[in-house]
């Protein structure tokens, strides 16, 4: 009985140490996250929303190729799984995607370094009879974009003036 109590006590002690707030137990080491440097700032400051100008399959192939990328791709009509629209994450948020190119916004350049990019499948604009017209965005696509954008904006504390379209940061492209 005494040995059992000793084992239970040891297990409780180890459990208490392992669950200490700010300490993360990793394979081969422990990570202490309780001390944050003040000389740091969040990398992400801008959310850039683009349209693809291509269909979904071409957009997916292009955005997973070697020359251009985006963090997210939302199809015109996202398929529903469990009642929720599916969105494709192509680049982890902590990694830089190549979606902004040569860009400028509110005094900052190289926006790929400080932004998250979302691509919306959409044919974009067409010229007809000398008139430029834009394809509308589907309601289902916008309904998928809203919770994703809200989540990103909240997590990175992105200011409203820093939620932009591609045309805002690179008007000539």
Predicted regions and their residues:
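C-terminal motif of bacterial Sec signal peptides marking the signal peptidase cleavage site
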Residues: 15-16
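Sec-dependent signal peptide recognition
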Residues: 2-8
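Active-site-adjacent loop/helix surface patches within enzyme catalytic domains
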Residues: 21-40, 46-159
């Amino acid at each position: 009985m005494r040995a059992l109590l000793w084992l239970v006590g040891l297990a409780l002690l180890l459990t208490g140490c392992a669950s200490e707030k700010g300490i993360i137990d990793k394979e081969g080491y422990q990570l202490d996250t309780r001390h944050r440097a003040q000389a740091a700032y969040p990398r992400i400051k801008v959310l850039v929303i683009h349209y693809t100008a291509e269909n979904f399959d071409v957009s997916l192939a292009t955005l997973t190729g070697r020359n251009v990328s985006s963090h997210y791709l939302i199809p015109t009509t996202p398929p529903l799984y469990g009642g929720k629209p599916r969105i494709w994450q192509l680049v982890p948020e902590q990694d830089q995607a190549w979606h902004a190119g040569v860009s400028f916004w509110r005094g900052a350049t190289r926006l790929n370094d400080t932004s998250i990019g979302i691509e919306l499948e959409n044919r974009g604009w067409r010229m007809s009879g000398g008139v430029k017209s834009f394809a509308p965005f589907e309601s289902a696509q916008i309904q998928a974009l809203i919770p994703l954008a809200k989540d990103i904006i909240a997590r990175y504390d992105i200011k409203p003036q820093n939620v932009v379209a591609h045309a805002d940061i690179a008007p000539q492209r």
